[in-house]
């Protein structure tokens, strides 16, 4: 493995529990916020060392509202990760975005409640979040064939799916995708000055958009399973397009602000 101090991170979503073949090592991490969802596996993709963490645990132990998001992001940064891809499953609120589509959102709407979504409970630290995703990492994915560039992802609390009225409300507000894990993952990355981009795989058309019985968990997992190898190939291809040196300044915004503690 390379040891260039420029490790990338990948946080796998539902059904995305492994990423590498052989030649890996596993790191058991502990953080001020507890342990992450699973041990972190480190392998190599092209010229990059990559740290992989399954968001929901190795066996999907954590539902979306219960994922230890703060521990996950802290553990990755403590390993030296500064750039993170977050593949995830999403429902479509746009009839033109059909199951199997891969979308790289550029905006986010938070409709969660009660999640631990900051490291800075004390001190005057306020994350710049107007553009929640790293433009440099987004470009690494949107430059790939067949990927949809842009869209607004609304993040709901879960673990239940949306009602028809909620889906129609989200769509009328201009949201294109609905998901359960994109927040607080994105804002915690920003607080830790990590570059972060979501890679959203559409698994279903949401209840308020399509006729029928609505979204069922079994159908979501089945659709993700059918497309998981495609998604992994896209993530690997995106990693190959990431520069060796981190050049993005968009996600580094704490300069001149006294932090209540040192970042790992």
From Swiss-Prot:
What does the record give as EC number?
Answer: 2.4.2.28
The UniProt annotation places substrate binding at 180, 204-206
| Keywords per UniProt | Glycosyltransferase, Purine salvage, Transferase
* pH dependency: Optimum pH is 7-7.5.
Q: How is its activity regulated?
A: Not inhibited by adenosine, potently inhibited by MT-DADMe-immucillin A.
Quote the SUPFAM superfamilies the UniProt record gives: Purine and uridine phosphorylases (SSF53167)
One GO cellular component assignment for this chain's record is: cytosol
Site label Important for substrate specificity, positions: 162, 217
Q: Where does phosphate bind?
A: 14, 55-56, 181
Q: Which GO terms describe its biological process?
A: L-methionine salvage from methylthioadenosine; purine ribonucleoside salvage
Molecular-function GO terms, alphabetical? S-methyl-5-thioadenosine phosphorylase activity
Q: Which pathway does the record list?
A: Amino-acid biosynthesis; L-methionine biosynthesis via salvage pathway; S-methyl-5-thio-alpha-D-ribose 1-phosphate from S-methyl-5'-thioadenosine (phosphorylase route): step 1/1
* Recorded catalytic activity of this chain's protein: S-methyl-5'-thioadenosine + phosphate = 5-(methylsulfanyl)-alpha-D-ribose 1-phosphate + adenine
Task: Output the InterPro entries linked to this UniProt entry.
Answer: MTAP (IPR010044), Nucleoside_phosphorylase_d (IPR000845), Nucleoside_phosphorylase_sf (IPR035994)
Q: How does it assemble?
A: Homodimer.
Q: What function does the entry list?
A: Catalyzes the reversible phosphorylation of S-methyl-5'-thioadenosine (MTA) to adenine and 5-methylthioribose-1-phosphate. Involved in the breakdown of MTA, a major by-product of polyamine biosynthesis. Responsible for the first step in the methionine salvage pathway after MTA has been generated from S-adenosylmethionine. Prefers MTA, with 2% activity on adenosine, 0.8% activity on S-adenosyl-L-homocysteine and no activity on other tested nucleosides.
Q: Which family does it belong to?
A: Belongs to the PNP/MTAP phosphorylase family. MTAP subfamily.
Full protein name: S-methyl-5'-thioadenosine phosphorylase
Q: Which gene encodes it?
A: mtnP
């Amino acid at each position: 493995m390379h040891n260039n101090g420029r490790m990338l991170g990948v946080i796998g979503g539902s059904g995305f529990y492994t990423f590498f073949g052989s030649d890996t090592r596993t790191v058991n991490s502990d953080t001020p916020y507890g342990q992450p969802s699973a041990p972190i596996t480190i392998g190599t993709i092209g010229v990059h060392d990559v740290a992989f963490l399954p968001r929901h645990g190795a066996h999907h132990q954590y539902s979306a509202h219960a994922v230890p998001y703060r521990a996950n992001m802290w553990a990755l940064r403590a390993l030296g990760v500064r750039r993170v891809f977050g593949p995830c499953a999403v429902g479509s609120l746009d009839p033109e975005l059909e199951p199997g589509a891969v979308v790289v959102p550029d905006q986010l709407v938070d409709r969660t409640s009660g999640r631990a979504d900051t490291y800075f409970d004390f001190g005057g630290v306020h994350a710049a979040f107007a553009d929640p995703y790293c433009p440099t990492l987004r470009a690494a994915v949107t430059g790939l064939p067949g990927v949809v560039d842009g869209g607004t992802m609304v993040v709901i609390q879960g673990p239940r799916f949306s009602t028809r009225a909620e889906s129609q409300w989200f769509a009328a507000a201009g949201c294109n995708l609905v998901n359960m894990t994109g927040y607080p993952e994105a804002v915690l990355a920003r607080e830790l000055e990590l570059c972060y981009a979501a890679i959203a795989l559409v698994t279903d058309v949401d209840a308020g958009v399509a006729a029928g019985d609505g979204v069922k968990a079994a159908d979501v997992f089945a659709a993700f399973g059918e497309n998981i190898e495609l998604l992994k190939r896209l993530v690997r291809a995106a990693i190959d397009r990431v520069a060796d040196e981190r050049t993005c300044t968009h996600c580094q915004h704490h300069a001149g602000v006294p932090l209540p503690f040192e970042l790992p």
